[in-house]
Amino acid sequence: MENTKTNASSSGMFSSSSFSVSYAEEMLLADEVSKINSMSILGPNQLKLCTQLVLSNGAAPVVLSLVSKEKKSISNRMLPKIGQRMYVHHSAIYLLYMPNILKSSSGSITLKLFNEATEELVDVDTDHDATQACIFAGRYPRSILAKDAAKGHDLKLVVHAVASTKANSAVGVLYPIWEDELSRKQILERGADFLKFPIAETEPVRDLLNAGKLTNFVLDRTRLGVGSKSDPSPVLLEPRAKITGKAKTFFIPEGPSVPNTTISGIAPSVRIDAGSPKGLGVPKGFTYESFIKDEILPDH
């Protein structure tokens, strides 16, 4: 098979040069590429979950390429001559959306597919309730040229979120899952709308503490009274001075007097008879003179 290659010269005139290709060799190379694509690491039935997209309220639309780096790498390294004969198919596209906002809030999510090579837009959903979890399922009905995909002119997912919540806060998270198959055959499918499968809210992850555990929780953190104490009922309080009875006078009898003598210059004193019933609790016959002489002045 012979083809003509046209180039632009420096003078601005176009010149042509011919080159020859072998259809058999081209098909053989295309088949080899298809076999590589069927390997487990790049299998055509292997769905890709590359990332998660956090959708912020009022932020710029999020744009994600739906052609994996593996397919672009194959296109760049192995398809310099047969890029026109290799295609990327998107036979399955799933978009799992999980909201971050409550049912009491409001908002909408817009999802579109954009073929950058042809600049065509396909609506996935233009007004999805941002509070509702769901899975979108569909496909792109045309093939993407492998040479375009290698240059980045591939199929893009465009997502935008707007809600009644705080600006730039997380409205929800989108998990794109897709299949990008590299093949030498083109697809020509009827266009179909994406299916939407709502996801119901689940039951609580775990049950709350039972009454016994809650009681123990309170007892561990609360100081409680003991017994059945209760406050008195309010009554009229009348403050009055208490009148005491007649004062009583007590007499402590003196002991018998002692001779008026002087010991070492110390004046005599009265002897205290502590042995009497109303004594002061000191030994019988105790005198301060003897105490001073025996205890305080033993060396004199």
Swiss-Prot record:
Pfam families: Bromo_MP (PF01573). InterPro entries: Bromo_MP. Its main location: host cell. It is found in: Host cell junction, Host plasmodesma. This is Movement protein. Belongs to the alfamovirus movement protein family. Transports viral genome to neighboring plant cells directly through plasmosdesmata, without any budding. The movement protein allows efficient cell to cell propagation, by bypassing the host cell wall barrier. Acts by forming a tubular structure at the host plasmodesmata, enlarging it enough to allow free passage of virion capsids. The keyword Transport applies. One of its GO terms (biological process) is transport of virus in host, cell to cell. The keyword Mitochondrion does not apply. Keywords: Host cell junction, Transport, Viral movement protein. One of its GO terms (cellular component) is host cell plasmodesma.
